[in-house]
Amino acid sequence: MANQHFAKEAPETYWKTSTDLPSFPALQEDTECDVTIIGGGITGITTAYELTKRGFRVVLIEANQVLNGTTAHTTAKVTAQHDMIYDEFIRHFGLNHARLYYEANQNAIDYIKGIVDEHQIDCEWIEQDAYLYTANENAVQKIHTEHEAYTKLGIERDLIKDLPIPLGSKLALVMKNQAQFHPLQYLKALLEQIVQKGGRIYEETVALDIKKGERPEVVTKSRHAIKSRFIICCSHFPFYDGGGLYAARMYSDRSYVLAIKPKIEYPEGMYLSIDQPSVALRYTVVNGEKLILFSGVSHKTGQGKAMSTHYETLRQLAESTIGIESIPYYWSTQDLVTIDKIPFIGPMSENEDNILVATGFKKWGMTSSAVAATLLSDLVEKKENPYESIFTPSRFHLNPGLQKVISYNADVAKHLIKGKLEKPDVQFEDISPGEGKAVTINGRRAGAFRDETGCLHLVDTTCTHLGCEVEWNDSEHTWDCPCHGSRFKPSGEVVEGPAIKPLKQIDLD
């Protein structure tokens, strides 16, 4: 990164560098269990923890290494303050629905805190108040309206004008008794508990397909199979759709994080702006000093301007508010957003109650993962759960769901058609080492990346998920799909799903 504030040339997440995670073998044989969990992030691990605690035989598989995806790149705010949602939820779904959503996520905070206390986990758990604020006089009424929603729902709250930190706030809404923590230190302890209780974990084990039945079967890339009573898909975007039409009901949204040594003295609290571009702040302590995690500048994955410019935009916003001494770490992440902003947690489809899913957390995965773990475990045990109807993937709300489905899929179609018609006028000699660009080969769009040795890597830019054309991400050095968020290495290997197969390599010889 060119700016003098950035201490590192490439993105790196603090959570990973500060945690020595265990490693696990790949699956080498067919096996059976009670529950197969696909996905080694916070949702899969927490669900495996809960199920092994309840006495179930669990196998968890991860395509890469555990805690290497979205969870490792979070800002780890443990809160039920999920942006400006409660007035919207009351208007669209009713007071009871909105109250249950809040209760589910507030209970999730207590659930996580209970695990931290039970196992004495050293994960920097600190209770914090969460602040929604605006620096725009024209948006003050929005804060008042959300405050009214908090009042209707009985949320412990406060309305203040001046924040403890100089962000130019005109008005702020406080949600009391939320929290922050170090997510990987917490989840490392859960991994240990899973293994102690007999759970089995396999890394580098890619799920390719699911065979339905009374005892459904996960088929892996190595052709080994896992039979179980239940399968739970926690793989971010579900690799298996099961007739649930998830590609038509979610989109992938990307955002950026700077870990900043600030010029100001940072107080307590977690802060989220409702203005555009929206930014969020919390702190973590590194080597005895507070670093501010300054995040935001979101956009749909694979869409918009050069990805590296988003870091610079975020840096400028931070410089103008908190001041910057240095930026020891920076990274980016993406998450899935459902059309109605409520996660999908429950049966993959109405006809398959033994294949379950958890996805679409809208970047609020710390509490959503705990909601999912308890709800999915109750479904496995055939126990009633008061939040089942809120999160069920088979729900359908006419307003605003239908309009957003139409709008979102029109956007997908636009990018699909645009990519197919595009014929980039870029020559191979125009691509410098470390650069990737779309090119035209034999009349067809392709992707070219030149590595530091000067070698050119060519791939077909057609995403192997549903056929959209991927775009180059100059910050992460990946090919990103603007339709459903799949990401690929310069040489075509899958970095992040829903795609399972790599981009096709092109050989000019």
Curated annotation (Swiss-Prot):
Its EC number is 1.-.-.-. Residues 423-509 form the Rieske domain. This is Putative Rieske 2Fe-2S iron-sulfur protein YhfW. GO terms for molecular function: 2 iron, 2 sulfur cluster binding; metal ion binding; monooxygenase activity; oxidoreductase activity, acting on paired donors, with incorporation or reduction of molecular oxygen. It comes from Bacillus subtilis (strain 168). Binds 1 [2Fe-2S] cluster per subunit. It holds the Pfam family Rieske. It comes from the Bacteria. [2Fe-2S] cluster binds at C463, H465, C481, H484. Keywords: 2Fe-2S, Disulfide bond, Iron, Iron-sulfur, Metal-binding, Oxidoreductase. The keyword Iron applies.
